[in-house]
């Protein structure tokens, strides 16, 4: 979920004029991170608009795009400075960030808490992150998630949800801000030191996220009962 703060820092750089949403960037093979990324499949020396990077980072959770954005925004140090300045004391980028090596070894690329990542989505929803215009576009990005198999699977498809998933071997996480018919609600689930490290849909962390999401929908919208249709899991990434 550290890609949300990276997105915010990128839009902050665009608002300051250091970057431009429509600027063309030159992709090089040296930027590739992992074999599963869409951006990593692009040919060397291809021109890519910055707007594609922000979309891929949030919608697909593309690691290559996200690390590139982290560098373009001014490195993890710049992202962390924005977080500190806006009251986020526990959310930090660790990877490729001087002084964060111990945290990187313990937590991975980044770290946050359920409260802080939920607060950050609320800040964007209330158009208070960077600027109203930037917040509006960031919120649109967050409502286009490709990863609909967990929290989103328990919410009707006709309800808009801003969300971001996260997963490493010993943790599964998701934050979601639901624009429900009777009012918004936000929640975040982050597992820690999880014993089940499988990548199957039945993973205990993902199962927990689905259960929490279903319970919250039933709680906040008791007069709008909804369940995934039989066989819906066949069409989940």
Question: Where would I find each of the regions flagged by the language model?
Answer:
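Active-site-proximal beta-strand/loop segments in catalytic clefts of secreted hydrolases
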Residues: 29-30, 58-61, 72, 95-96, ...
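Structured C-terminal helix/loop/strand segments within mature extracytoplasmic catalytic/sensor domains
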Residues: 72, 76, 119-149, 159, ...
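Short, well-structured active-site flanking segments
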Residues: 12-32, 76, 131-134
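Solvent-exposed, acidic/flexible segments
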Residues: 1-4, 18, 43-51, 58-63, ...
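Mid-domain, small-residue-enriched loop/turn segments at the edges of structured enzyme/sensor domains
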Residues: 46, 54, 67-126
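Extracytoplasmic
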Residues: 1-2, 20-22, 83-88, 107, ...
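Active-site SXXK
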Residues: 1-25, 57, 187
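Flexible glycine/proline-enriched surface loops and loop-helix/loop-strand junctions
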Residues: 49-53, 60-66, 97-105, 171, ...
């Amino acid at each position: 979920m550290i890609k949300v703060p990276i997105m915010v820092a990128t839009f902050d750089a665009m608002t300051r004029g250091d970057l431009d949403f429509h600027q063309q960037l030159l992709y090089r093979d040296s930027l590739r991170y992992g074999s599963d990324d869409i951006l990593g499949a692009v040919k060397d020396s291809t021109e890519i608009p910055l707007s594609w990077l922000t979309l891929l980072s949030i919608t697909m959770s593309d690691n290559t795009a996200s690390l590139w954005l982290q560098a373009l925004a001014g490195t993890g140090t710049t992202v962390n400075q924005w977080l500190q300045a806006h009251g986020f004391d526990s959310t930090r980028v660790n990877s490729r960030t001087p002084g964060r090596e111990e945290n990187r070894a313990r937590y991975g690329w980044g770290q946050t808490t359920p409260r802080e990542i939920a607060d950050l989505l609320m800040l964007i929803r209330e158009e208070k992150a960077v600027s109203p215009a930037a917040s509006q576009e960031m919120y649109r990005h967050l409502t286009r998630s490709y990863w609909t198999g967990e929290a989103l699977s328990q919410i009707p498809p006709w309800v808009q949800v801003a969300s971001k998933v996260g997963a490493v071997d010993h943790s599964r996480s998701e934050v979601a801000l639901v624009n429900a018919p009777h009012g918004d609600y936000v929640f975040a689930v982050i597992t820690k030191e999880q014993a089940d490290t499988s990548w199957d849909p039945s993973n205990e962390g993902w199962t927990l996220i689905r259960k929490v999401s279903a319970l919250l929908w039933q709680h906040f919208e008791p007069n709008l009962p909804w369940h995934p249709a039989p066989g819906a899991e066949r069409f989940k990434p």
